[in-house]
Amino acid sequence: MSKKLQIILLFFFIASLIFTSFYIRDFRIDASSDSLVSQNDEDFKYFSYYQDLFPTKNSLVIAIKSNSKIDRVLIEEIEKISKKLSDLPEVYSVFTINKAPILLLNNTSLIDLANNNYETILNSSLPFEDILNEFAKSPIYSDQIINESKNITSIVIFLNENSKAIDLKNNKNLYLTQGKYYKIKTEIDKERNELIKKIRNIIINSNQYFTYYLGGVEMISSDVISYVKNDILTFSLIV
């Protein structure tokens, strides 16, 4: 290859980098629920309609797998993780196997439940294995907070409502016309990503004898943006 040709190729390479860097500022990635699913999708419309009628809190789930069966060590670890999660300002509440009422072994009544007068795996004198068996066979708890094999449990993290996100969703067209939509969306994405980082740090600093899996729409949105950004960066470098 001649020196002149090398100079020309180098010139075009530098020019393309300048061009890309100039316009990349206007590139936005939206991984909200209404962008991950087509807004014209009938199932999504149906879900959104009933979500407005019967609102539920956004949630994340940490699945925890034991190398053997669920034991007292795991129960104690769940309690430690739950307390750390509950201290996060973004978290409304946490539900785990530790908070699940024992219903059948001690004939807990609806009145007992209403008065918060019930036993859990933390305060019960009933045999530990019997409690796990009840939970694993329960239509309420099975495959929710415990699996049939009794080696996987979960922590359900209910998140506080994000007033900015609700306002943005309800007034999307207005903010788009005002040119404010992507600025507010970026702030919301940043807050969500920070929350995911906090939760992952809690997991990393937990007992690594167990295996942890973090899931949920908020986590998926965060990861989608990260993956796409990394792919774009890699592609731009290759090109």
Go through the PLM ranges and name each one.
Residues 65, 79-106:
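Short amphipathic beta-strand/extended segments in non-transmembrane regions
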Residues 2, 85-86, 203:
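Hydrophobic C-terminal alpha-helix "anchor/cap" residues
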Residues 59, 89-101, 142, 208-215:
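Short beta-strand elements
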Residues 79, 104-122, 225-233:
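Charged, often glycine-rich, active-site loop that binds/positions anionic groups
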Residues 46, 74-77, 81, 90, ...:
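Stable alpha-helical elements in mature extracytoplasmic
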Residues 1-29:
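Signature of alpha-helical transmembrane segments and their immediate interfacial
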Residues 52, 76, 125-239:
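Extracytoplasmic
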Residues 24-68, 75, 122, 129-146, ...:
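Solvent-exposed, non-transmembrane loop/terminal regulatory segments of multi-pass membrane proteins
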